């Protein structure tokens, strides 16, 4: 059955023997993260890797608070979260389900159309459902800011974790951040860390290539156009992770294009009006597992995350209107933070101990001003800790990998399988198996990946033949070591890189490497015969299979 909320999920984890309740006093300052880190690395490399989920019930400095961690931290829990608990289930089943959602077969006859109706009806039943505030558990307790007519809010009452010694402060690490496209009014749900500055404000780690950052840039363009009083004015922001942290405005007139200007050359009144503009934001913390997971899924722009969550859990997500902003949030979340980001306002964010295993250093990011906090009675705070792999996000990343496969195959159908090794923190290495059909096919795949959404950040791409199991890193290593001539088969290019990449020559820009480890063809300039790989005779394999147990070797 689908999990209605985080509490249903916790009950299931408890019932399945996947939860440990910690009643010893533990501090959210470094101590919880150390326990979660050690737990995530238990039985590393085995089928039982990841340890149990952790429910802290005695949080130092926060009487009555509870904190859930490592909820996605094992293969079994990741499958449970996505309703895949049969012994024969694997995360590959997620890819099959996603294909139905994003790419139903085109009907070619009336009979095919009739067969498609039940599938369309099923997908239609997963769209989010708006319910009234009185039925929304997240509205059980409401705190409004003084500006909103309330008695005030205090984010510091939440047991937000500081996870590593050099972190810039406590960070909210498992939020579902809701924004709205100012051009289309479509909602987006993403996951971005939030540094807590004080009781009313946080940072918003909106890297420039993320959807929420694009929403803010669009909102900034609109505000700038209105401020300058000319409908032909277009504004572009070079902000989000850019250490210059400036707004460049390009004025277009009938006489041509004016050069970009520094903010200091823009009239003060104009910049003031831009900064006074706002973009509304809402944050849900502690949702059901499918909703939390949907916030990190690389969804096509036309597919809303709430729909994906409903599809994954087999039941629509119930939403409720916010109190102070025009956004809809999961009705049964543990906490809801409502507020706004001021256009043009930036503040230092970081450092932060990141999933790369290194600190992400300080930079300038938008500031989230909270106008209202609503929560359930006796709320449960959900958090994660990232660091040197393997961590909880390794299993979340593996599920994303399985969802990413059918999305890639829409554009590159010759892809057979893909692997994003957690040791390479996902965006640093992608291994791809393809059905090779022509000379240079592997290079076409590399360039296609670097042109595809969030895959553009991939630092290294390895392409192998379809008979290579990309999930077996030993086999991949064998193919790479034996199948390449380094000068011939390694390709370098320049392009955007992840903001977390501390090794790139410039922030957000650097080099990438592609390795063609496929068999080489005469059309690719290989003139010698390509040797066959070793393989035992099938008759011998079958005979020894039947004899193996009797030999008692293992």
State the predicted function of each range:
Residues 222-269, 273:
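Intrinsic disorder/low-complexity segments
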Residues 1-224, 262, 266-554:
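Extended, highly charged
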């Amino acid at each position: 059955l689908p999990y209605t909320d985080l509490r249903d999920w916790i009950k299931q984890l408890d019932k399945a023997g996947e939860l440990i309740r910690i009643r010893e006093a533990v501090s959210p300052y470094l101590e919880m993260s150390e326990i979660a880190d050690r737990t995530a690395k238990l039985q590393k490399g085995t089928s039982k890797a990841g340890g149990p989920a952790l429910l802290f019930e005695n949080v130092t400095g926060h009487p009555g608070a509870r904190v859930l961690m490592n909820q996605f931290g094992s293969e079994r829990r990741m499958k449970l979260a996505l309703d895949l608990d049969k012994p024969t289930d694997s995360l590959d089943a997620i890819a099959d389900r996603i294909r139905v959602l994003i790419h139903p077969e085109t009907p070619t006859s009336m009979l095919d159309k009739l067969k498609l109706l039940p599938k369309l009806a099923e997908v239609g039943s997963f769209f989010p459902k708006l319910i009234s505030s009185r039925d929304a558990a997240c509205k059980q307790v409401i705190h409004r800011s003084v500006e909103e007519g309330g008695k005030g809010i205090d984010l510091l009452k939440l047991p937000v974790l500081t996870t590593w010694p050099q972190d810039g402060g406590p960070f909210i690490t498992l939020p579902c951040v809701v924004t709205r496209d100012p051009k289309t009014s479509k909602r987006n749900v993403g996951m971005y860390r939030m540094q807590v500055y004080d009781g009313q404000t946080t940072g918003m780690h909106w890297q420039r290539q993320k959807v929420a950052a694009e929403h803010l840039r669009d909102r900034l363009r609109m505000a700038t156009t209105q401020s300058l009083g000319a409908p032909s004015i277009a504004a572009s922001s070079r902000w989000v992770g850019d250490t210059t942290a400036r707004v460049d405005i390009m004025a277009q007139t009938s006489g041509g294009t004016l050069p970009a200007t520094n903010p200091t050359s823009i009239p003060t009144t104009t910049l003031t009006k831009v900064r006074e503009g706002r973009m509304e934001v809402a944050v849900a913390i502690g949702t059901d597992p499918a909703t939390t997971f949907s916030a990190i899924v690389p969804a096509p722009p036309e597919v809303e995350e709430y729909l994906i969550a409903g599809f994954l859990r087999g039941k629509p997500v119930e939403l409720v209107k916010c109190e102070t902003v025009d956004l809809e949030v999961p009705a049964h979340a543990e906490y809801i933070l409502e507020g706004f980001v001021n256009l043009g306002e930036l503040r230092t964010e970081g450092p932060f101990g990141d999933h790369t295993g290194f600190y992400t250093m300080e930079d300038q990011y938008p500031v989230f001003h909270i106008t209202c906090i609503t929560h359930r009675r006796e709320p449960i705070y959900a958090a994660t800790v990232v660091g040197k792999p393997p961590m909880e996000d390794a299993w979340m990343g593996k599920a994303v990998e399985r969802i990413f496969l059918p999305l890639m195959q829409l554009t590159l159908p010759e892809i057979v399988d893909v692997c994003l090794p957690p040791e390479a923190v996902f965006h640093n290495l992608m291994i791809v198996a393809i059905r090779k059909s022509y000379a240079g096919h592997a290079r076409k795949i590399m360039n296609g990946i670097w042109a595809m959404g969030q895959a553009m950040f991939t630092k290294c791409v390895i392409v192998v033949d379809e008979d290579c199991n990309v999930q077996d890193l030993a086999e991949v290593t064998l193919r790479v070591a034996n199948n390449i001539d380094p000068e011939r088969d390694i390709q370098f290019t320049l392009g955007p890189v992840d903001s977390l990449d501390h090794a790139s020559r410039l922030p957000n820009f650097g080099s990438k490497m592609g390795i063609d480890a496929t068999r080489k063809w005469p059309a690719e300039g290989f003139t010698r015969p390509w040797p066959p790989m070793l393989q035992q005779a099938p008759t011998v394999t079958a005979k020894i299979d039947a004899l193996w147990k009797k030999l008692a070797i293992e």
